[in-house]
Every structure is written in C-alpha cells, then in structure tokens.
Amino acid sequence: MKKLSLLLLVCLSLLGLFACTSKKTADKKLTVVATNSIIADITKNIAGNKVVLHSIVPVGRDPHEYEPLPEDVKKTSQADVIFYNGINLENGGNAWFTKLVKNAHKKTDKDYFAVSDSVKTIYLENAKEKGKEDPHAWLDLKNGIIYAKNIMKRLSEKDPKNKSYYQKNFQAYSAKLEKLHKVAKEKISRIPTEKKMIVTSEGCFKYFSKAYDIPSAYIWEINTEEEGTPNQIKALVKKLRKSRVSALFVESSVDDRPMKTVSKDTGIPIAAKIFTDSVAKKGQAGDSYYAMMKWNIDKIANGLSQ
C-alpha cells in the first residue's frame, strides 16, 4: 500500500512538472532583435506585448557604421528573429551587421530578414550598382507600411498562434501611417514652388523627395563617405546662393557644425533639427517612427513656407 501511494505521488509530481513545463513553453515569448530604433518601434507597434524586443543601435546613434557590443552579440545569438533594414545600411560602410550575424551563427531568411523587402530602391547619384543603394527608404511613409507588413509576415510565421493579433495590429498601424502620408502630401504641396527644397547634411531625403514631390540638396551624400569637407560645403553654398530656399535642416544624429557653416555663408537660417536615422529619446518629441515622421513633415512645411 505504501509502495502504491509512493508511486501515485511520483506520478502526480511528474504530471505537475510536465504541466508547468508545457505552460512555460506555451507562454514563451519570441525574442526579437532590431538593428535600430526605427525598426524596433515599427516592430513594437505590430508585436505589442507578445515579444521580448532588443534594439541594437542606441537612440541618436548612426546605424550606418556601428560597433556591436558583447551584449548585442549575445542578444542576437539568442534571438528567434532579427530584423534589419538592408539596402546598404547595416551592410554598407564597415559592414557591422554582416560580422554580427556571422559571429552569432545566424542564417539569412531563416533567422534574419530585411524589412525593406519589395521596396523600390533608389540609388545614390550617378550609381546603379549593388552597394550604392540609398538606404533611407523609411522616410517615405508608404515604405514604412511595407516595413510593417514584412515584420507582421515574419512574426506570424515564427509565432503562428498570435498571427491574428499581429494582423490586427498591422491593419490599425498601416491605416495610421497611410493617413499621415496623405497629410504629408497635402502640407508639402502648399510650400511655394521657389522655396521648395529640403537641404540637409546627409543626402538622405531621396525617398521623401520622390514621395512628396520636393527636391533635396545636401552637404555629403551618405554617412559612410567623407562628411562636411570644405569642398562639399563650398559646392552646396554655391547652389543655395542661386536659389530662394528659406530654411536649412540638420539631422538629429549628425554633427551640426558643417550645416552651421553653410548657414553662416549663405545667411539662410537652420529652421529645425529633423529625424532621419533614429527616433528621439523616450518622452521627447519624435520618440516613435510615426512621431518622428510627423515632426519632420511639420518642420519642413513650416520652415519652407516662411
């Protein structure tokens, strides 16, 4: 009788252990790594509280050239899914992402995915070859919707039990971005034609320019090149002296000294800081993808209408 009772107790204990283990497995959240704060924010809007999310490049830092920390390698090696921009961002310059996923023993299209998949690529000036793509596709809100859709698709594949949750969030989020896209087109269209030009430090507004029908100019073309050389500044100053542009802009993640020199030499004021490669710090204006795009649209429209 004692043996029978002991056996029953062991069986019940094992059953309880199995039930707890099964519950932990069922409750286990996906671990997701995003290469920068913009992709992380879009992911958060789709994934909600269903994932554990880590963003590699800190807010305010340049994602073109970054040196991953040991913690980044650890998080990446443990991740169920990794989202990166692609099109010459993390794999351009010092190719930091290529090295990271190699060290983390991750495989493309199995562990890590480009959220820019199916975006119509724009190239750097006078270039059409691989490695010369302009990576700033997210500055067109329509491309932001493509990013969100790709993230939703991959999360649904990795975590099918929450597929309907991800789809529902995508529908709401994409509608929000679509509405802002229409607002952008309307606001930018009201800028006087002779003043219609976005002038920034890096030439990162090609996608924005095409989407919202506004030309752009810059000091240097991409952050992996020389930045703010005397010849670059001289060329932009010469161009601006022939224009009626009323405002300059400087990105939040770059050194503002070259643009201050341009402003001094042309007499054109710097209207505002705008966001390109990173969202703002939490609690500040522009601390999400939606908020940074709204900020940019408002500052550009207001600055160039003066």
Swiss-Prot record:
It comes from the Bacteria. InterPro entries: AdhesinB, Bact_metal-bind_prot9, Lipoprotein_PsaA-like, ZnuA-like. Residues 1-19 form the signal peptide. It is found in: Cell membrane. A lipid is attached at C20 (S-diacylglycerol cysteine). GO terms for cellular component: plasma membrane. A divalent metal cation binds at H64, H136, E202, D277. Disulfide bonds: none annotated. This is Metal ABC transporter substrate-binding lipoprotein SloC.
